[in-house]
Amino acid sequence: MAHQNNNVFDLSINLKKVEDTNKIEKIYTYNSSVVKSSDFIGKLNIVFFEAKDLDIIIGNPSYRRRFLDIHISQQDISYLKSLQRYNKVLQSRNRILKDIKARKSSKNELEYWTEKLIQDGIKISKLRKKKLEEISTETLKIFPKLSKNNEKLTIRFIPSFKNISSLNMEDLTTIFNENFDKEISNGSTFLGPHKDDFEIQINDKNSSEFSSRGQIRTATLSIKLGEANALKNSLSDTPIIVLDDILSELDFDRRKTVVNFIREYEQIFLTSPDDSLIKSIVERDDKIFNVNNGNV
């Protein structure tokens, strides 16, 4: 059962084993009705932090794009639809490029898919840039409070379309026309949101290459909390924050700093396999839930 904006609704995810396979199927329900996983997005705004989120800094660009896409989709369902359309068009366009190379299709057929790709591509990349700037603004307020040292954090968007803010349909059509032969030779689309990326730097050095594990963890947590603040500013509603085992790799001073800071948020779920860590930070109004073999 969830409460948001004075509305009450029931969200659940059930796991079901698929017969004669080792696969597990997820069944999503919203107010007792079975829905698609994408229908969950935006129903309840949550910012979730786990160890895997360090890939925002050290992982490949696809993880950073996914981070942005989930963040934006929680605020704008039309963005999610544009992204879904774009991915389908991208698949079709890449197939046509391969067919042209094999002399099974013509360049004329490619023009239709290029136009469709650009239409959604412009919206996606421009919105990613805007929303990353919002996250960055909030993150830069948080990072100095969580970092032990006087460190400088920088977040920089790297769009596939250069100068994306000033480009229009005509500009991008020209750019694609200039790259047709290379794309046909390669059998794939060179430009577009599927190539977007962003970079995090600490003290003007790429964090993925030059930062310590502690710096990366602090920067990632700052980004996730910056995301929460950006969501709150956009939706006028504070998201639920779930922090999965963030304390175990922090020293005592940094752990104390993080815990004191996150208490500013309205609703937080903090998990740890070490109950002594939880007990060391608990206060009178906090609630502790013990989970054993899936039972609370």
Where do the protein language model's features map onto the residues?
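Nucleotide-state sensing region of NTPase/ATPase domains
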Residues: M1-Y63, D69-Q75, Y79, L140, ...
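A structural signal for short hydrophobic beta-strand segments in well-ordered beta-sheet cores
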Residues: I13, I288-V291
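Hydrophobic/aromatic beta-strand patches that form the interior of the parallel beta-sheet core
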Residues: V47, F269, K287-F289
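Active-site donor-binding loop signature of nucleotide-sugar glycosyltransferases
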Residues: A51, F157, V291-N293
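Long, charged N-terminal accessory/stalk domains
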Residues: D55-I56, Y63-N108, E115, K123
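Conserved NTPase motor "head" modules and their coupling/switch loops across ABC/AAA+ ATPases, GTPases
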Residues: K101-I240, E249, D253, T257-N260, ...
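Walker B catalytic acidic pair
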Residues: D244-I246
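H-loop/switch region of ABC-family ATPase nucleotide-binding domains
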Residues: T271-D274
